[in-house]
Amino acid sequence: MKFRTKPAKGTQDILPEDMALRNYVQDTIRNTYREKGFTQIQTPSVENIELLSNSDGGENLRMLFKILKRGEKLDLEAGEKELSDLGLRFDLTLPLSRFYANNRNDLPMPFKAIQIGDVWRAERPQKGRYRQFMQCDVDIIGESSIVSEIELLTTVPEAIKRLGFDNFKIVINDRRLLKEMVLTSLIDEELFGTVCISLDKVDKIGVEGVRKDLAEKGLTEVQIDALIKRMDTNLASLDSDAAREIKQIIDVVSAYYPVEFDPTLVRGMGYYTGAIFEVQSSEFKGSLGGGGRYDTLLNKYQNDPIPAVGFSIGFERIVDLLKSKNMKVETEEKIAFVYIDPIYLSKAVALSQELVGQGKITSLYQVKKNKIGKKLNRLKEEGFTEIIVVDNLDK
């Protein structure tokens, strides 16, 4: 029996050239964040199932990869309801909240964190969407003022700009304004999450599609009309603490990047409590990144409330866009030492070792005499900047 060689649906093999591009994107993002005072941490890919399943993770809860218990823990005859006690993380924010609660005594306040790692979601694969994909997150924990939002909204766009994207804008809203919009449309607060799921589809299905979706969920025509009318709300007409904060954020950030208020912006995570935002590009249908404030997520670990704000870059989308532009990472100096006769092996190794620590990439190749020409051409195609044929023990 021969096994299939293609990776599982929604995952991908990454070739060396693509890996070089991914490393470049990671390094650019990481270095930008470090310049703004953020430090990198790492959390496990596997978390306890109760953390993931009781998280207000929105639609992601339906796409959770669960890990079956093993050995004596998987006692099917005992009639256990839960066959899994672990799961793969579907974002980096939940693990960060657990990490902070576990290590807060050893961390500065506020804590400015960088996370770069894979996450998993059991969703239907499509172009630009994978079941395993990388996220690049930056979060500020312990600061309740809007300085956190402003710092993130001037840091993440800078990383995106350094990656070569210019035609983008920041859109911003606030979960408190969303709730106000729903409640003033005579819709019960218990339906807030349901209504937000419909509003979140407006870019895909349009206003009429949202109207139909809400009707199917049982909202009356009066409620739907009131909500649709408020979807055109002008920020200047709003007078609340949330509206004033959004205005101030826009006033500061707009000096550096284009920012606009979007009353229909939802973001999928139910744990957001305040400002929410996205970076949208005209070069890609969808966002290049997004995030928001989540001031209650850490409450499940401790009694005192800890405010927090985070922003996640759409790493895979950015990589796909750069690949579509045929972007090539600047080639490092690569030197190949080629020999035919085995007696030159030691000499080739010695020459290679002389370059250790000089920042040059070296490789050794033994080639058959009748294939030397073909091999040299192949090495040039692979990006070697210098090819040395070792055929003399004295030089």
What are these regions (language model features)?
Residues S55-E59, T184-S185, A275-F277, K380-E381:
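Short low-complexity, flexible loop/linker segments enriched in glycine and/or proline
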Residues L88, N173, I187, I313:
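A conserved hydrophobic position in a structured secondary element of the catalytic/binding core
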Residues N60-A78, L186-V210:
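Acidic, His- and aromatic-enriched active-site or binding-groove loops in soluble protein domains
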